[in-house]
């Protein structure tokens, strides 16, 4: 227990210093280190157990006793606490709590003569500025608001800024919160105000909207959600093809007079939207050379290349360079079946 340790005469006996010398014994230096460490431990206990009624009388008395000793040591000698205490205690006891004549922790930063310990949370330096007319030992973080700011997750995208006010309820576990995202405890109440996500990924809770509108963080120019039509193929919508209709082609397969041209579908077979060649970007965004039509058999991700070939009768025809199926042969099979499901079966083969 902290109280049992303080009952030892080792802590209660006053330390003697040589006012005319800047040197002290090793024993006195180590004793002063332990006294400061005890005061820091009591400060941590007071912060954890702080409530609306204030800390317990026992804790208040212990803090008062330790802070009085520290004040006397720092003002009656030319040696400052910073010169005596030059150590880093693993970030555990680097803060000395406030003390004033009211025998309780105070948040008063308006006194003209303050003895400030400005503790930098990043490098844990103990800086002490001594004034002879001061009755306060102030722990001032961030210089103005008396908040202890712990910045965790410095290597992640989101830094945690947890501001704790010593006037309200504190939870010591929150000092080590490594997964927070801008959770600030308000200085005036106990409400947890969650700030807006800087990545602007707040999605509107209205799940009935199919386009998933973003709430207050997405601009009105966001492209709408594209609804895919329910077709047998993601490339061509076969439900738009009338297989009963007579097939016509601008390409003449009877002779080789139009060998330079490529097979095309008439407007009566496919809609104008589906008859457009699919141009996909490859590499650094350079579009592939558009082809007149895709192969209905293999459905490659990009437009297949066509090569010239001959059928059994010796006629020059266009063949898919990927699967080798004739364009006209496929259409002929689809027409003869007069069944849309047969098209799907041919695709799956």
From Swiss-Prot:
GO biological process: negative regulation of transcription by RNA polymerase II; positive regulation of transcription by RNA polymerase II
Keyword Phosphoprotein in record: no
Region (Disordered): 95-227, 250-294
MF-aspect GO terms: DNA-binding transcription factor activity, RNA polymerase II-specific; RNA polymerase II cis-regulatory region sequence-specific DNA binding; zinc ion binding
Taxonomic superkingdom: Eukaryota
SMART domains: ZnF_GATA
Any one of the GO CC terms: nucleus
Composition-biased stretches (Basic and acidic residues): 196-212
Keyword Acetylation: no
Annotated coiled-coil segments of the chain: none
Keywords: Metal-binding, Zinc, Zinc-finger
Record's compositionally biased regions (Basic residues): 278-289
Disulfide-bond pairs as recorded: none
Listed Low complexity bias regions: 95-169, 177-195, 257-272
GATA-type zinc finger locations on the chain: 295-323
Protein name: GATA zinc finger domain-containing protein 24
């Amino acid at each position: 227990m902290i109280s049992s340790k303080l009952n030892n005469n080792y802590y209660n006996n006053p330390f003697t210093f040589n006012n005319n010398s800047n040197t002290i014994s090793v024993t006195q230096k180590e004793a002063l280190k332990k006294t400061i460490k005890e005061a820091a431990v009591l400060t941590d206990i007071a912060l954890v157990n702080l409530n609306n009624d204030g800390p317990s009388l026992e804790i208040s008395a212990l803090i008062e006793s330790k802070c009085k000793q520290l004040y006397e040591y720092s003002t009656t000698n030319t040696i400052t606490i910073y010169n005596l205490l030059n150590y880093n205690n693993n970030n555990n006891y680097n803060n000395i709590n406030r003390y004033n004549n009211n025998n309780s922790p105070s948040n008063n930063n308006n006194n003209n003569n303050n003895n400030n310990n400005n503790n930098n949370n990043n490098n844990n330096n103990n800086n002490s500025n001594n004034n002879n007319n001061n009755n306060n030992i102030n722990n001032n973080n961030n210089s103005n608001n008396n908040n202890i700011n712990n910045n965790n997750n410095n290597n992640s995208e989101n830094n945690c800024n947890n501001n704790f006010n010593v006037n309200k309820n504190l939870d010591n576990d929150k000092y080590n919160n490594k997964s927070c995202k801008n959770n600030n405890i308000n200085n005036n109440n106990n409400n947890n105000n969650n700030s807006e996500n800087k990545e602007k990924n707040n999605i509107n809770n209205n799940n009935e909207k199919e386009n998933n509108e973003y709430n207050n963080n997405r601009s009105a120019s966001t492209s709408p959600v594209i609804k895919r039509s329910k077709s047998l193929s993601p490339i061509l919508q076969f439900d738009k093809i009338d297989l009963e209709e007579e097939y016509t082609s601008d390409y003449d397969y009877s002779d080789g007079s139009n060998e330079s041209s490529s097979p095309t579908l008439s407007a009566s077979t496919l809609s104008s939207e589906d008859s457009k060649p699919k141009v996909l970007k490859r590499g650094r965004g350079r579009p592939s050379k558009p082809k007149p039509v895709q192969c209905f058999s293999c459905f490659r991700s990009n437009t297949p290349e066509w090569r010239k070939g001959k059928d059994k009768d010796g006629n020059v025809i266009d063949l898919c360079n990927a699967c080798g199926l004739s364009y006209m042969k496929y259409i002929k099979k689809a027409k003869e079946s007069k069944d849309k499901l047969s098209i799907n079966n041919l695709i799956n083969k």
